Amino acid sequence: MRTLRRLKFMSSPSLSDLGKREPGAAGTDERGTQQRRACANATWNSIHNGVIAVFQRKGLPDQELFILNEGVRQLLKTELGSFFTEYLQNQLLTKGMVILRDKIRFYEGQKLLDSLAETWDFFFSDVLPTLQAIFYPVQGKEPSVRQLALLHFRNTITLSVKLEDALARSHARVPPAIAQMLLVLQGVHESRGVTEDYLRLETLIQKVVSPYLGTYGLYSNEGPCTHSCILEKRFLRRSRSGDILAKNPVVRSKSYNTPLLNPVAEHEAEGTAASGTSIRRHSVSEMTSCPEPQGFVDTPGQGPSGTFRSSPTPHSGPCPSRLYPPAHSPEQGPGHGSPSTSSPETLVDQILESADSDSEGIFIDFGRGSRSSVSDFEAPGGRPSVV
């Protein structure tokens, strides 16, 4: 009995006793929460003061950057970390941009251009890298600190001052920093897509950069170009008569899927087999002669291997014409061949000069220097083959 009575007195406290102890425990928890909040507020204030000091050109003391980094890491672990982006936009960046804007807000003309260029140099070279270093623990989240800072600079400074009027003035000298600023800001986009502020920025870029390919087309000093943009590759060469540069015509292919030539076979000439010499020549395989549009004018030009001319009027229907090898031996005397003294430069000049008058392409007649030999390469019907 004594043992049971002793166990009864040693048992857990009653509910009334627990009720008396709850206010003390709750007060301890509340004091701990208040201490954590006070510590978080102190961290917020230190980050706020450090960022504002950067915008005020005061810089950061030694070891201050490390302290701010640790403060940002601690805040991200608390319940206040979810509001970090909103606090950065509404408090830190907005106040900092207003500090920079107030110094140039009432400037106009050339003074505004020079002051804005100096402000951009300071922001882009000092403020932006420092902000990225302070908020380094936040990297990987979208939108990034760099993107938020550039968007606030665009909306608070670039689009709020009288920059368009300053650029529209005659004899305005645009500093290179202004062009850099506009092009850098043009590369920053919002999650909503193209906004009205972005289109206003493009209007400013058109006054500095020409030509400029914007959201709604190509702009130049003469005005917007509504036609489609065509990239043209220009080839320049030296004329035979002098140093005049001429434009090379574009050689177009009528079919990109059907090859014009079949594989080439090699065989030894019959006439040289008995003499013991091993001379090989390439047999001319089947070449499809595709019809070309009408209206070409013959423009003969002397080349090293034949005559270049345009194709005559094609006949109707498909292109079944074939190229057949000549019946006579391919070997010719030294008097009938192409001149051996022709250099590659002369060859290129002759080809380009013969093609200057043809806007559709280059057509080659595989002749041997005489009209009689050219007829051997003609397809049935007297139509020369076209490459």
Curated annotation (Swiss-Prot):
Residues 13-34, 262-387 are annotated as: Disordered. InterPro entries: Bit61/PRR5, Cullin_repeat-like_dom_sf. GO terms for molecular function: GTPase activator activity. Keywords: Cell cycle, Phosphoprotein, Tumor suppressor. The keyword Ligase does not apply. Residues 305-314 have a biased composition (Polar residues). Ubiquitously expressed. Expressed at high levels in kidney. Pfam families: HbrB. Residues 18-33 have a biased composition (Basic and acidic residues). GO terms for cellular component: TORC2 complex. The modification Phosphoserine is found at residues 253, 373. GO terms for biological process: actin cytoskeleton organization; cellular response to nutrient levels; cytoskeleton organization; negative regulation of apoptotic process; phosphatidylinositol 3-kinase/protein kinase B signal transduction; positive regulation of cell growth; positive regulation of cell migration; positive regulation of phosphatidylinositol 3-kinase/protein kinase B signal transduction. Associated subunit of mTORC2, which regulates cell growth and survival in response to hormonal signals. mTORC2 is activated by growth factors, but, in contrast to mTORC1, seems to be nutrient-insensitive. mTORC2 seems to function upstream of Rho GTPases to regulate the actin cytoskeleton, probably by activating one or more Rho-type guanine nucleotide exchange factors. PRR5 plays an important role in regulation of PDGFRB expression and in modulation of platelet-derived growth factor signaling. May act as a tumor suppressor in breast cancer. Associated component of the mechanistic target of rapamycin complex 2 (mTORC2). Binds directly to MTOR and RICTOR within the TORC2 complex. Belongs to the PROTOR family. This is Proline-rich protein 5. It comes from Mus musculus (Mouse). The lineage of its organism: Eukaryota, Metazoa, Chordata, Craniata, Vertebrata.
